[in-house]
């Protein structure tokens, strides 16, 4: 519903995609999280479920090989966006990393997170995420 509303309102929609290669298990992340996932050119690299149908409507899709996307943060810094909203998974890893990178490259853009459209690995993380985001000066929607 959120993506569809943004699309109907002619808002820019962007996605980041976790992107790994067949050598994933030899990377730093792969050594700490030894579960092959999001391997490029496999079904697991695609956007999941209903979200996948919106990829063709995206202004931009960023493949990222680490938790955050420097390319996304730089893209936002070159834009005229006054506000950006983040949502997705995994809240305490990829979403949080992208927020921090965006803050690093963009001192003026307002950053929002919709907690109803963001999920972490467990309930404890989800229950404490709001506090961390607010301390990072992120506007939190519930």
Residue ranges and their predicted role:
Residues 4-12, 27-142:
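Active-site-adjacent betaalpha module
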Residues 10-23:
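PIN/NYN-family metal-dependent endoribonuclease catalytic core
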Residues 1:
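Short amphipathic alpha-helical segment that frequently serves as the phosphate-/nucleotide-binding helix
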């Amino acid at each position: 519903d959120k993506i569809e509303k943004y699309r109907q309102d002619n808002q820019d929609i962007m996605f980041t995609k976790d992107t790994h290669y067949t050598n994933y298990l030899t990377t730093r992340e792969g050594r700490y999280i030894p579960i092959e996932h999001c391997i490029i050119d496999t079904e697991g690299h695609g956007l999941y479920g209903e979200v996948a149908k919106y990829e063709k409507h995206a202004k931009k899709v960023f493949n990222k090989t680490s938790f955050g996307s420097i390319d996304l943060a730089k893209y936002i810094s070159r834009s005229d966006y006054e506000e950006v909203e983040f949502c997705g998974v995994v809240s305490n890893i990829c979403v949080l990393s992208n927020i921090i990178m965006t803050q690093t490259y963009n001192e003026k853009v307002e950053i929002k997170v919709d907690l109803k459209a963001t999920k972490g690995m467990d309930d404890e993380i989800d229950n404490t995420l709001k506090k961390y985001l607010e301390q990072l000066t992120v506007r939190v929607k519930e």
